[in-house]
Structure formats: structure tokens, C-alpha cells
Amino acid sequence: MNSLKKVILISAGDPASISSEITIKAIENSKIIKNIRPIVISSLNLIEDCKKNINSNIKLNEIKDKVNFSDYKENNLNIIPINLFEEIFFGKPNTKYASFIKNSIVDCVRIKMNSIASAIVTNPINKEIMYQSGFNFQGHTDFLASLSQYKKNPVMMLVTNGLKTIPLTIHVPIKNIPKLITKSLIEHSINIAKESLISLFNISKPRILVTGLNPHAGENGDIGNEEKKIIIPAINKAKKKYDCFLEGPVSADTAFSSKKRNDYDVAICMYHDQALIPIKTLDFFNGVNVTLGLDFIRTSPDHGTAFDIAGKNIANPDSLIAAINLAYQMSINKQDG
């Protein structure tokens, strides 16, 4: 295969969600970079049902060569079938779908690690449904880390045009955040961010901004002491240890202005909303979630299952398209590096 042509594996996501709809729409869309060869790991019946629901005429091509993908066909929806025994009702989540969801993710990783595929893109899943079925992970990121051969703690990065952010803490209550922010976590995130910006984003000298936790970054201890006791010492140590440009702690209310965004390549934020609000405000439909620190490239659309609009043929595929295109570009950068 031409070195510029890249196979990108796409997981099924939750079958009751918008995942199948946005997958079909994305693969049919001209915004997908021409050299990308997307392959979906899902149920044939599920995709056929969704095709009918959204009036799609795209042909399905079953992939049997899971190493070199020699039977890939252009202008088709190429699929590696997996079993889904339950009847699907779009918009109605069910714990019975959990094994199918999990199997699609596991197969994505397994095939990626044993083939010429360049990256995986995961479609949205519902954490509550997965928890109820005995899924013992906080989400995709932790589960993918358990399947990775690397033993690094993975780092979540959100990407949109003109901004990249990393939340130090993710799906935890606000009241727990201060005790979860540690010097070692900050240093680890800085290191993974630096390595990834160089190897996957082709940024030779990364500039990293670190936000404060408290209003006005603590105002020298007058509004909380996390900056003085934890964040500043961690930044100072990381500057010496990793030899990279670091700025912070910067108050989050100024970190994302149009002028300030020109001063850094990624902002490391203290918690989920601090990192995601600016991404979604800037470009709600084109945000991408990237997992750093794995031994494979993984991206996903930066939105959820949207059960409320599933089956209505109104789901927007742009975030999935952006995730597929970014996975491709990262694989090219990694190859060139």
C-alpha cells in the first residue's frame, strides 16, 4: 500500500446511539482526506438497518484480510463484521449491548496491533450503560490503556482548530479535584504532552501553558494554596527535567483569549470543564478527543451518544470526520518522524 494511504479502524460505539449514522455519513463525506481507508468494526445488520433509516445507498464490502486489507474497495463502506445478537432500537440504550460495544473496541486494538492499520477511531459509548453491565473502567481512555502494551498512564487531549487542551482530572466531582492534583501528575502530563507534540503533531519545540486551579491562579496564596504548594513547584521541576518551554500557572479566565492562544501549543488544565469549555465554545462540531501515551494512535469525536436524536437522521458527522482526519495526519507525522 502507498505509504500515504492509511487504514483507519473505526469502532462501532453504542448501537442504540448516533454512532452508526455518523459513521455512514462520515465515510460518504468528501471532507474525508482522500488517502484515508476507513474500515468499520461493527455488525452488518446494524449498518444495513441504519443505511435504510438514513436513506443511504453506499455498498458494504466485507473485509476478510485483517492484516493487509487487500480486499478493501474504494467507494464502499468497508466493514469487519462482528456479531450483534440483540435487536436494536435506536435511541433506547440497553445493557445487553455492552458485550458488542466492548468486543468492537477490543477487536479494533487487536487488529491494529497485528496489521498495517495506522490508527483507531472510537465511536461514542455510554458510561452508565457500561458500568451497569460490569465494565470496570471510567471510560474509553482507561479501557484502552488496559489493552495497551505501554504501562504509561494515558493522557486525554482535546483538539480543535487553534487550540489543544489537556485536563489533568477528568470525570470526577469538583470537590475531589484539589486532592487529585499532584506534582507527579502535572510532571507526567507535561512530559507526555511534550513527547506527543513532537512525535504526533510535528511541533519541534512545544510551548506548554499550565492553568491555575483557583480564581486568578490563587493570587499568591490569597485564594487557595494549590498553586504555591503543588502547581508552581511541579512546573519548575518539569522545566529542568524535560527542557521545554513552560508558562504558568495562568489564570483560566485569560488563558483562552484569542491573543493568548497564540502563545502556546497546548494548555494543561486542572479539570474537565476548564479544558472542554473553550474547545466546545470555539468549535462545537469539530472537536476531537485524542489519547496520548498509548502504543497506538487513538482519536474519537468530542461528543456523546446523543440517544435523544438517534434514529432521526439529523446527527452531524463533523466531529467524527475531524477525528478520522486527525488520526490520519498524526500517523503521517509519526511516520515522517
What are these regions (language model features)?
Residues 147-163, 292-308:
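Short, flexible loop segments at boundaries between secondary-structure elements
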Residues 1-140, 184-270, 274-280, 286-288, ...:
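Contiguous, glycine/small-aliphatic-enriched amphipathic segments in soluble metabolic enzymes
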Residues 125-128, 135, 162-163, 171-174:
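Short acidic/polar capping segments at secondary-structure boundaries
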Residues 142-146, 150-152, 172-198:
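Active-site glycine-rich loop that binds ribose-phosphate moieties when present
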